[in-house]
Amino acid sequence: MVHRFYERAPFPGYPPNDSLTALRARAGRSEFVRLLDRAIAGDARIVEIGCGTGQMCLYLARADRVVIGADLTRASLALGAAAARRFGVGRVQFVETDLLRPGLGAGAFDVVYSAGVLHHTPNPRESFATLARLAKPGGVIVVGVYNRYARMPSRLRRLMGRLTGFRFVPFDPVLRDRQADASRRQAWLRDQYLHPEEHRHAAGEVRSWFSDNGVEYLRTFPSVVFGDDSGELFAPAADDWSVETWLAQVGWMWTLGHEGGLFFTIGRRKR
């Protein structure tokens, strides 16, 4: 079902007359993306699981890094590969694979990255277990999923959209931006409000995935520890406590809700 959804509409796609400079400028507006790029070694071997049309792969493929973009959707991979050729990015490869049977070497990667993917699988916990095996001992795993609390504003917007046949979706920053490319707005509408399968997760739940699969928890982004602004994604955060974690997630309804409610959890596979 999810495969057919993205074959019909690859996400997120590329705007007309795009360039590598423009792509990197767009990605660099995200604090998380800048911190991730800074944290990854210049010679790292990286795999992105569920890479879509490959923007993050192209952004990270700099210095001496080798980047593998893996996705189930052939149409998305074709767009990513075409963009790599057009932009002259050589140290990236796109492969068609199923997350549950990835066909990639276990323990082969310094960084395993997956954003906006696990929550669209039938069993996100099982999907994470497969993904975690791809990291080397000591390798870093970065996963982004919808947060149970931060996703609430999007769910309310979806309800309002259904009442109007999605002719009106209130307070959505992408759909409200009339300067944005029409194809981008349509792709965002489909991905955020019309997806056939969606799960939402609390920070503690995702941490349990890590501990159950031999992955040391490092931190979340945004942090669930008040006052934690170290700026080092791969450094362990200070210990948190349950009330603090809950309050932080409630706050994400305002800070992340306008962008879909995605949060990241970072861990290191135990040696």
Question: For each predicted feature, which ranges?
Answer:
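Conserved SAM-binding loop of SAM-dependent methyltransferases across substrates and taxa
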Residues: T53-D64
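A short glycine-rich, Lys/Arg-flanked "PGG" loop and its adjoining helix->strand segment in the class I
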Residues: R125-P137
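Conserved SAM-binding strand-loop segment of SAM-dependent methyltransferases
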Residues: G88-L100
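Conserved class I S-adenosyl-L-methionine
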Residues: V140-V174
